[in-house]
Amino acid sequence: MFFKKNLTTAAICAALSVAAFSAMATDSTDTELTIIGEYTPGACTPVVTGGGIVDYGKHHNSALNPTGKSNKLVQLGRKNSTLNITCTAPTLIAVTSKDNRQSTIVALNDTSYIEKAYDTLVDMKGTKNAFGLGSAPNGQKIGAASIGIDRSNGGIHAADDTGEIPVDLIQTDHWSAATPTWKASSNGAFCSLTSCSAIERGYSVAKTGELTPVAITAVTFPLLIDAAVNDNTILGSDETIKLDGNVTISVQYL
């Protein structure tokens, strides 16, 4: 039985032995139940630059006119941000995300997709990795966004108590497992814990060339945000349409 504790501060391990008795025999056989938990000495704080706001600005509704292309979604383009995590002591962590607007995601497919997403510049045609952008005044879903960690140009920086360390981005699809399986990240795509069926996507860092999370005191993740929305024939043109995406980014302790 495995328990994970978030924002924890000490370490404990206790074991409880339970004997099994037979009413008909004098001999006995035993089994053990072990209760474990970990309270890490380091507490970590995540901060997204710009107060956590990604602002696509104010525009006239005509910017949402139909595209006239095979891809029906209007592309809003790319925004950059940075996730900084600092810890009071070297700590093993994973980063997860939760979409608080999941019910407003516009379904993505071959004719409605986010163009050139992530650091791989791939067309994102799968809904499971998408994040919602809220609803228009007429009740229609506004659009979808992708969020990814930028692995290019050495943008990920990490340090432990000895100083900066070279790292690679690694990921697991089951971060809360007793022993998560880690692999090199293919595109750094965030996958919401609320919309990725049977997947608990988590990101961490490993020393360059390795696949085991390394304890860090600080790490910087450059973020890439790409968004696309329905056109104004769907969202309407008589009222103000406000993007309302909201994502919780969490530090999980390993």
Curated annotation (Swiss-Prot):
Protein family: To E.coli YhcF.
Superkingdom classification of source: Bacteria
UniProtKB keywords: Cell membrane, Membrane, Signal, Transmembrane, Transmembrane helix
Principal location listed in the UniProt entry: membrane
Stated name of the protein: Protein GltF
Inducing stimuli: Repressed by H-NS, induced by LeuO. A monocistronic operon.
Endpoints of the signal sequence: 1-25
Species name: Escherichia coli (strain K12)
Transmembrane segments: 213-229
Entry function: Involved in induction of the so-called NTR enzymes in response to nitrogen deprivation, as well as in glutamate biosynthesis. May mediate the glutamate-dependent repression of the GLT operon.
Pfam family, one: DUF1120
InterPro entries: DUF1120 (IPR010546)
